[in-house]
């Protein structure tokens, strides 16, 4: 996932008030078992960092996306940081099905991490994803040293790896933290993910001419997703979806995207455009004011659908995403681009 515009959008998100409703659904898996009688707990994270504790961590603090993934696997963090509460008090989609009434908050927007409150929670472990190697997402650079002195951290690499491998990695960490990988909700979610993947593969095979593009935007630029850098989009391409994407990303912007000015927003065209649905992203209604964008075939045809760019890496999370995607693509025309 991108650092730019992800980082840019994170900053913009301070003022965002509109969000995508969080989904309800499957009963949650049982909480991870306590560590009574356990010996030394060890874990090697995706930085190659070896963590060794006297017993299994009980008090886990996690970035919202990591918390959401762990929650689906049965781990109950004591606190979260990163987007989790909307301005109206509702749950931000980025935190998945985490019960935000039952967890502490140590930061809700980019750059916000209350180190003093974090320390007061007596954490055993901090968990966060990493889009850039060795950089924990939403842990401010200026706070890293202080955070590291309070408790060890475990990073999960979210770029440069296949979608399923990232999901499995969160599952492995959850199991190490005491969650039951064979709990009925976890097994049901895996089956649902497999079924959604198969259904999307069938749709792709039946509609090879349906062209799909994925974008995000800021007031200054349109960002067209570069397929190889996004685990979810790459997975859909492997299932057979006809993804329109740049030949290479804009390297000066950190990869992940080709950055296109709004005047050149018609450089790539597709029958369907999936638009970043994060609360901090530029909204479709706002993008409508950009003349070149408004003339795109998919825009004129009304074939704009959400892309859940910050979906949690769990079977349940991506099962829901692919079910929604299949429903949207089924109703889309494949002759919009001539």
Regions from the PLM with identified roles:
Residues 1-12:
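Bacterial N-terminal signal peptides that target proteins for export
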Residues 86-89, 132-142, 156-173, 209-235, ...:
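Extracytoplasmic ligand-binding site segments that recognize negatively charged/polar headgroups
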Residues 63-117, 121, 130-136:
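A short, structured surface patch at a secondary-structure boundary
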Residues 149, 165-166, 264-338:
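Structured C-terminal subdomain patch of bacterial secreted/periplasmic proteins
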Residues 115, 122-128, 265, 269-273:
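Proline-aspartate-enriched helix->loop->beta-strand connector
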Residues 59-73, 181-245:
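Basic- and aromatic-lined ligand-binding clefts that recognize polyanionic substrates
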Residues 13-14, 18, 23-41:
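Short, low-complexity, disordered segments immediately C-terminal to signal peptides
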Residues 145-218, 311, 315-338:
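Extracytoplasmic substrate-binding proteins
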């Amino acid at each position: 996932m991108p650092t730019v515009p992800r980082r840019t959008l994170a900053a913009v998100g301070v003022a965002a008030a509109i969000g995508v409703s969080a989904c309800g659904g499957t009963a949650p898996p049982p909480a991870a078992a306590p560590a009574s009688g356990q010996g030394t707990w060890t874990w090697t994270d995706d930085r190659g960092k070896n963590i060794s504790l006297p017993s299994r961590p009980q008090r886990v603090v996690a970035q919202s996306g990591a918390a959401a993934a762990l929650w689906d696997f049965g781990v109950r963090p004591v606190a979260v940081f990163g987007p989790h509460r909307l301005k109206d008090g509702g749950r931000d989609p980025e935190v998945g099905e985490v019960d935000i009434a039952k967890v502490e908050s140590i930061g809700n927007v980019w750059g916000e991490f209350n180190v003093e409150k974090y320390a007061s929670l007596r954490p055993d472990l901090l968990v966060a994803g990493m889009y850039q190697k060795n950089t924990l997402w939403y842990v401010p650079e200026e706070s890293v040293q202080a955070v590291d002195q309070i408790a060890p951290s475990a990073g999960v690499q979210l770029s440069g790896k296949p979608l399923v491998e990232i999901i499995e990695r969160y599952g492995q960490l959850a199991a190490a933290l005491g969650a039951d990988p064979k709990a009925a909700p976890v097994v049901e979610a895996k089956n649902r993910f497999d079924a959604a993947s198969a259904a999307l593969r069938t749709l792709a095979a039946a509609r090879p001419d349906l062209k799909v593009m994925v974008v995000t935007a800021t007031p200054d630029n349109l960002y067209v997703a570069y397929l190889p850098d996004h685990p979810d989009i790459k997975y859909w391409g492997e299932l057979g979806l006809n993804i329109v994407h740049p030949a290479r990303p804009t390297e000066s912007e950190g990869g992940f995207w080709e950055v296109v000015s709004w005047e050149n927003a018609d450089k790539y065209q597709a029958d369907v455009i999936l638009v970043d649905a994060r609360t901090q992203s530029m909204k479709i209604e706002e993008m409508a004011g950009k003349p070149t964008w408004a003339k795109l075939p998919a825009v004129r045809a009304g074939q704009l659908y959400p892309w859940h760019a910050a979906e949690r890496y769990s079977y349940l999370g991506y099962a829901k995403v692919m079910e929604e995607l299949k429903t949207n693509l089924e109703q889309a025309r494949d002759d919009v681009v001539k």
